[in-house]
Swiss-Prot record:
Belongs to the class-I aminoacyl-tRNA synthetase family. IleS type 1 subfamily. Its main location: cytoplasm. A motif ('KMSKS' region) lies at residues 602-606. Monomer. Pfam families: Anticodon_1, tRNA-synt_1, zf-FPG_IleRS. InterPro entries: aa-tRNA-synth_I_CS, aa-tRNA-synth_Ia, Anticodon_Ile_BEm, Ile-tRNA-ligase, Ile-tRNA-ligase_type1, Ile-tRNA_ligase, M/V/L/I-tRNA-synth_anticd-bd, Rossmann-like_a/b/a_fold. HAMAP family: Ile_tRNA_synth_type1. ATP binds at K605. The gene is ileS. One of its GO terms (cellular component) is cytosol. It comes from Photorhabdus laumondii subsp. laumondii (strain DSM 15139 / CIP 105565 / TT01) (Photorhabdus luminescens subsp. laumondii). This is Isoleucine--tRNA ligase.
Amino acid sequence: MSDYKNTLNLPETGFPMRGDLAKREPNMLKRWYKDELYQVIRKAKAGKKTFILHDGPPYANGSIHIGHSVNKILKDIIIKSKGMAGYDSPYIPGWDCHGLPIELKVEQIIGKPGEKFSAAEFRAECRKYAKEQIEGQKKDFIRLGILGDWERPYLTMDFKTEADIIRALSRIIANGHLLKGAKPVHWCTDCRSSLAEAEVEYYDKTSPSIDVRFNAVDAVAVCEKFGVQAPEQPVSLVIWTTTPWTLPANRAIALHAEFNYQLVQIEGECLILAADLVESVMQRAGITSWTVLGHCAGSALELLRFKHPFMGFDSPVVLGDHVTLDAGTGAVHTAPGHGPDDFVLGQKYGLEVANPVGPNGCYLPGTYPSLDGMFVFKANDVVLNILSENNALLHLEKLQHSYPCCWRHKTPIIFRATPQWFVSMDQNGLRKQSLQEIKGVQWIPGWGQARIEAMVENRPDWCISRQRTWGTPMSLFVHKETEELHPRTIELMEEVAKRVEVDGIQAWWDLEPAELLGDDAANYVKIFDTLDVWFDSGSTHASVVDARPEFQGNAADIYLEGSDQHRGWFMSSLMISTAIKGKAPYRQVLTHGFTVDGQGRKMSKSIGNTISPQDVMDKLGADILRLWVASTDYTGEIAVSDEILKRSADAYRRIRNTARFLLANLNGFDPEQHSVKPEEMAVLDRWAVGCAQAAQADIAKCYDKYDFHTVVQRMMQFCSVEMGSFYLDIIKDRQYTAKSDSLARRSCQTALYHIAEALVRWMAPILSFTADEVWNELPGKRAQYVFTEEWYGGLFGLAAGELMNDAFWADLLAVRGEVNKVLEQARADKHIRSSLEAAVTLYADNELADKLNSLGDELRFVLLTSQVVVADYEQAGEDAQQSEIGSLKIAFRKADGEKCPRCWHYAKDVGLVAEHAELCGRCVTNVAGNGEERKFA
């Protein structure tokens, strides 16, 4: 028996079947950075229209987690896909470097400033620590395949950036948005500092829920409002609170002007309660019998006075819209120093802003004898005892509720009135302007707009001052007596900024006031407050986007972060940009959800369900992680588990195998020498290129809409359905058995080449390492890297007016699917082992029969059978099976003739040529003749 193996065009490629990504990717990275790939891309894209994604800076503390990976991979996909779409899309990664978490870490290492180290030395240690953390995170981000200017990232602790943060504050002051006041702010007693809204998390906490009597000072006057005479018993207004420790700071009781209040008589006393809440109060207090003596509107009780249960002063009734009927008594204990609503109401009525609590959360001396020096949360029980002793406690129970906690310490926080600096929301119209700007931004998903609008509508003034060591100084001078800002504040801040640009933030603490103020220094003091870290990152649209030459003075096109950043970075950036520029800092805002495990649970070290991106990369490779991110609908929760990653690895293999098939069958193909003109190609080959053209249009559109999971689905459909289960199956015969330089084979290779050129570009934004690998195996002259390219422009398709147009091949796909069902059953019944052992008869109506017959003898190649006959639908016998195509029945039988050992087809003409006695006539033509001709498939 002769060996005809060397007459076949067997596939061959250096592109391995196994990705072995964990080992191969690090070597690719070395080449990328040796070649300075990021700069290569910048040079290639120079002069193109810019697309700017501004990186929200991660905090420079700790290793990156799976959420960081999601965020950075999504950004990288956008950057790379925009490059493919013809944009110059630079990426400047950044880090948030100041703030409390780093201070706490450094305190653990060297102690608090002032103990063994000066504040200046402490800041230097903080800077050093942040730098070390950045290097660790940077290494992991690079390992993910994220391309960016890693040699020149932006850091909020860069001297120039620190100076520009100070300049941003000066512009806010110049535009009239800065406000100073003793307002209640979120205060962490562990941090001993105010917290921003974004630094507050909510956890369940059990608190005492109490109803407290405030006895009427003038019961006669009170009862008159209810239209009744004063009874003999005491009359009290009942308030409800879950923070007994705030009662020493009570200065009023708030009612709603329009609510109906009732004077209710119970055994031994009369109570004033909101009419709608009387029953619930009585029920929880265990009171079964009561009589309503009278009623009046809340407004009728305004400014009537009630005795504080134990502080020895009176509390007036004030009216506030924040009073609700959701719970409680309809009367709200009001402590202007311990709550924003209380503060606003207190301002309206001129109430004292009492703050009896120190920075450590303990009562100040002189508050109340048994409370002085006690921590507020421990004081709750003492306050309850005092209330009981004074017969003021109507009812006590425990309530589990959501309570604000410090994001760092996870401990409950308090509202505490302290002198602070604020960006005012209403002093100069910032709230109104911000709400207007929100409307001009595209929010993805769309619900983001309503969310941030609600936040802006309801947010208090932004407290931007902090009493910390490691942060950008506010750089302000205030008058010793009036506490007014220096009249030359803007000019002075610029002088400070110039010094900070040279020496960093330490320049402010080293500065002697006289150096800038001269004789004025005697009347002014330096403010040592630092800026909220959210001010640092929120001003990077000015300190980074406006300043870096790569961005060419353009505003950011998109901000992309987790959905928690509506109240964080998106908010602070919007506030600062609107305050200094009068416009939003972004055109689009895209948010992604948080990572959860396969059961939808939040990632937690205590549960043990965390997945480390480093472990995934070491085991599976970064491209699997990237494909998982791209495959997920990131607008909701993003599930990850070993099983989910395994599915991503399976999907990866299908894409890799498609790429490998293309490359292996381009062996010996030079696009410059061997490409076939479209009009000379087999129709099926042109159809396949047209499929790629349609897929590319869909994929490019989805990339543009940031719809990456649909990109992956479309790519998988193309690889698995249009190519894998149809086209690539069909062409194997022609590719392997036709003469190597025949038109039939070169037509096929031309199609494969165009498809590979397109596919590698679709892959590049997501499967960056694999795309680079494919790119280096593709034949022909090309740029060094796929990342400098644009969507492939060499695709073409079938004309709609052609007989064998896309609709024709869609029908053929359907017919082949029905034939496959019959052959699968025959295989299951052990009638055949391979479809080439089969002959099929297709009984079709005239319209379908004409289509099938138009392919002539090449129909068998489309169906992967050795023989096929097309017959009239009405002639079908009982052996023919009705298909799901109404006009088609299919009959199966074993193929006639013998098996050709070269092409494996069964044919009657095997052995008719003596010199090649084992071959079919077609193979003889391909081996010893001019080669077969293929017009269609």
